[in-house]
Structure formats: structure tokens, C-alpha cells
Amino acid sequence: MSSFLIARSRGVDMIALPVFPSRRLFQTELSYHVDSGITKPEELADKRLGVAEYQQTAALWIRGILEHDFGVSQYKIHWYMERSEEMSHGAATGFKPPAGISFNRIAPNKSLASTLLENELDVAHVASPWVLRANALDRSSRIAGKGDWNKIKPLFPDRMAEGARFYKQHGFLPVNHTYIIRGDIYRKCPWVAFNLYTGFVKAKALAREQLLERIPTALFFAPEYAAMTREMIGDDPFPYGVKANKVMLDAIIAFSHEQGLTPRKMTVEELFAQSTLDL
């Protein structure tokens, strides 16, 4: 979503659907090294914080939440980025660190996990430095590092409590991704946006009906956790549409501009297909 905002602010010919298949409470995935002296998020000023990529959506939400909810300015943190200049979203957008930001790159033979374990970072966006998903860009799954794993702790020991706090305060869960239509296709076939949106809405409804049936049976208390989640954030934690996501969209647009990723605040009319704006 962040790279899409950047691209649209530069006039890239594409349009989005208000369909958000992935949401995460990114701040709850931060881990810290106990030797950093950190005990709570308000103490991150002057600390070294590592993210996979500076411009990506996860890092945007982390910066915005740390600043607006915990009073830690992005300018008070020393930022470290794992992905290389070539292997990153920034390679496509021509990313340059915003003025005034303390920005550093992690050495190519190291990773977020290894630098955190070896106390070269105080905090990193890795929920578990020793259990990481492999992908084509991030190195932590291949370079786990050496160190005492017992010294790595979650910044938010009770992730569910922090999630409940955030949702109660803001009324939404942060989005990660959306779906994009090329501008030439949208102009040639404008009906495709509404039809795709309708299809995604129906698919989500079918998936939710079968949710508990698809949870592995090894997760013995899945129904109880599903009930807890429903009590915390309601029946639909993944709402689609512009109207249902207005507060969230206003927040991510504002964060992008505040953080110097976009030169101005975008409008939803610039971002989403016309036929979906009233949905």
C-alpha cells in the first residue's frame, strides 16, 4: 500500500480497488535486545531500529504508531534497512531517505535477525528472530545470526492487549496490501473495477463461512481464539470498501505525507476506481 501511494503521487498510471486482503498490527511484531535497556515503546528515542525496508507499508505503520500513540518521533530513531538498494520496492520507486532521517543499511552479509541477536540493533521488526519465513528479498531466514535468544523479547509482551488497545483507540486494523488495476486496462474496461470488487466481496464471505473448518485441527483452541477475536474487533476484521475504511485510509495517507514518502496528502479519489468510491 505504501509503494502504491508513492507511485500514485508521482503520476504512475494505475488505480486501486478498496480490497485489503492483509492486515497486521505491525508494532506488536517488534522485538528488542534486553541489553538495550528498553522496557517500553516510549523509550525508543535514540535507539537503533531495523526494518526490512524503509518505505514499505509495515515500516510506515510502525513509524506512525510510534509517533502518534507513543510520542517517539521518527527523527529520534536511528533507522536500519535490511533490503539492498537493488532488491527492494525502493528500486522501483527511486527511494531516497527523507531529509533529516538517520538512515543506515544493514551489511549484505547480515540480517535483521543476526544484527538483533548480536546486539547491533536495539529493536527490529522480527516477531521471532529464530523462526522466520523465507522470501526472495529478506535475509533473516538465511542469516539467523549467533547470540543468546533468551535476550530477545517482544516489545509488547501481550500482543493481544496491544491489539485491543489499538483497535479500541483507532477503530481499525492497519492494512498491508491492496489490489491494483493498470490504468490502460481500467480506461478500456472501466466495468472491471466494480466487477472485481464484487467478486472479492463474495469470496471473502465464502472464506469467512468456512473459517473454522480450514483451521488445522492441531490448533485445539482455535474456536475460543476466534471468539476472543470477534469480541475484540467485531464480526468483520477485514472490511472492504472506501466508506468502511475511511479512518484507516485517512491515517495511512497522512502518515505517508508526514514521513516524507509522498510530497502531499493524496485523496481517495486519486487512489481508487470511481465506481468503488461510494462502496
Regions found by a protein language model. Name each.
Residues 1-89, 94:
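Short, glycine-/small- and polar/acidic-enriched structural segments
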Residues 2, 89-212:
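Pocket-lining segment of extracytoplasmic ligand-binding domains
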Residues 39, 77-114, 267-278:
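Short helix-initiation/N-cap motifs at beta->coil->alpha
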Residues 46, 174-178, 235-237:
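Short, solvent-exposed beta-strand edge segments and adjacent coil->beta transition regions
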Residues 50-54, 58, 104, 240, ...:
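Conserved aromatic-histidine-acidic binding/catalytic patches
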Residues 180, 185-258:
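Secondary-structure end/capping motifs
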Residues 247-279:
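Tryptophan-rich aromatic "cage" segments
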